[in-house]
């Protein structure tokens, strides 16, 4: 059995390596899987939740998370790979206890000439109190499980759009890049690779800042308030017309 070989190797010269076990989340978890996890608990460092992160509905993914996480040990890292990985998917995964997330969102957008644009920083306590989850009469409370994963348009600036021909502002107000929208639009129109390099840099920076902000509010025990603030600030509560 493969895990037995892994156990032998880890007990010899690879004691510092990690063993990540892939578990399908789209099937009913039977006793074989739970027995395997229990038997090799000492060598399994993390669990990769496979079979999710594609085009499944919000309800399907939420149910899968709940089913699989109920039987997994709390002390194991949980991994997931998302074919998209937009901000709502990130918040949803962390909300359900996923530790490591591999998204494709920043790269996919850059490849297609698009930039991430979103409000990130809930700067003060007053903002946080406005979304206090203890107040049951608060209208600013949303269920992350009920939001549409695919409402990406709220986070995207499509620099292929001709409307940016004369727009000399930077990509976003919080971008690390100084190039203007009009310049990047020109590069895209000329099929210059530089445009995708600039957009990849921008998108990765924004996503890194996003994860840092999430980590900050988790440490401050304020993550649920941040979710509600993020939804409200980025107008994700509004239905598409």
UniProtKB/Swiss-Prot annotation:
Keywords: Glycosyltransferase, Transferase. The keyword Glycosyltransferase applies. GO terms for biological process: tRNA-guanine transglycosylation. GO terms for molecular function: glycosyltransferase activity. Signal peptide: none annotated. Pfam families: TGT. The keyword tRNA-binding does not apply. NCBIfam families: tgt_general. Belongs to the queuine tRNA-ribosyltransferase family. This is Queuine tRNA-ribosyltransferase-like protein. The lineage of its organism: Eukaryota, Sar, Alveolata, Apicomplexa, Aconoidasida.
């Amino acid at each position: 059995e493969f895990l037995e070989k892994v156990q032998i190797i880890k007990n010899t010269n690879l004691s510092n390596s990690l063993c990540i076990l892939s578990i399908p989340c789209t099937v009913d978890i039977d006793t074989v899987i739970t027995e395997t996890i229990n038997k090799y608990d000492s060598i399994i460092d993390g669990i990769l939740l496979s079979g999710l992160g594609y085009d499944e509905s919000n309800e399907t993914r939420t149910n899968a998370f709940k089913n699989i996480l109920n039987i997994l040990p709390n002390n194991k890292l949980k991994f997931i790979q998302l074919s998209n990985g937009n901000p709502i998917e990130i918040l949803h995964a962390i909300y359900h206890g996923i530790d490591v997330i591999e998204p494709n969102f920043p790269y996919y957008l850059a490849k297609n000439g698009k930039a991430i644009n979103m409000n990130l920083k809930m700067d003060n306590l007053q903002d946080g109190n406005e979304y206090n989850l203890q107040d049951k009469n608060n209208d600013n409370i949303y269920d992350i499980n009920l939001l549409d994963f695919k409402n990406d348009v709220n986070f995207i600036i499509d620099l292929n759009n001709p409307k940016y021909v004369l727009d000399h502002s930077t990509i976003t107000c919080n971008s690390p890049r100084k190039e203007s929208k009009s310049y990047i639009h020109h590069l895209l129109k000329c099929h210059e690779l530089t445009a995708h390099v600039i957009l990849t840099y921008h998108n990765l920076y924004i996503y890194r800042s996003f994860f840092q902000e999430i980590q900050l509010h988790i440490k401050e025990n304020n993550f649920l308030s941040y979710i509600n603030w993020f939804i409200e600030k980025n107008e994700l509560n509004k239905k598409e017309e």
